[in-house]
Amino acid sequence: SPAEKILPEDPNMLLQSVHFVGDYIFAIYMKDASSRVYQYTLDGDLVREVALPGIGTVAGFDGKDDATETFYTFSTFTAPPAVYRYDLATGESTLFARPEVKFNPDDFVTEQVFFASKDGTQVPMFLSYHKGLKKNGKNPVYLYGYGGFNAPLTPGFSPTNIAMMEQGAIYASVNLRGGNEYGEEWHKAGMLANKQNVFDDFIAAGEYLVRNKYT
């Protein structure tokens, strides 16, 4: 018999993995360089979007056919990977375990901004910093970007970045063309004859930060 399409392709998100737990399908997508998770019935009907703890990167959602719960890990720019328990029926996530750290992750914030590159292309960038930061044009910024080899740059934890943010710095992570945050066209737009786009994106990121008084 012919194959039946259960989860149609979504032009606005990249499907990264699919997991079967209990009587449900969990689809992990990447949208604007961070994770989204959707819960479906086995027939492909949407149950809900999983309410994640914030902007970050997710993994997990595995389990047995008769499971009533599942677990996933969630990491951000400002907190190390933590494990959450997810109730399949209610959609509620509860913290199950996380490493002990000598700082309060709630003291920091991450926002996502979009800016126009030289050719007008909208490029996303994550900005992480200590709460209470003043946009007065005087903050030091660590601007990091990678655009190549079809590799995405998604939220991840670094204690070094936390140390910088504790001293008043901003950690800026820009999703340059050349990665796969938006699929193959985004990848091709930053390779070979289009490589200049990668550098233009990075320069435009710095200009955005200056123009908006982050630094």
Q: At which residue positions do the language-model features occur?
A:
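Well-ordered alpha-helical segments embedded in enzymatic catalytic cores
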Residues: 5, 20, 201-205
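Structured, non-catalytic alpha/beta "coupling" segments that mediate domain-domain communication
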Residues: 67-95
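A detector of repeated loop/turn-to-beta-strand junctions in beta-rich toroidal repeat architectures
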Residues: 34-36, 80, 139
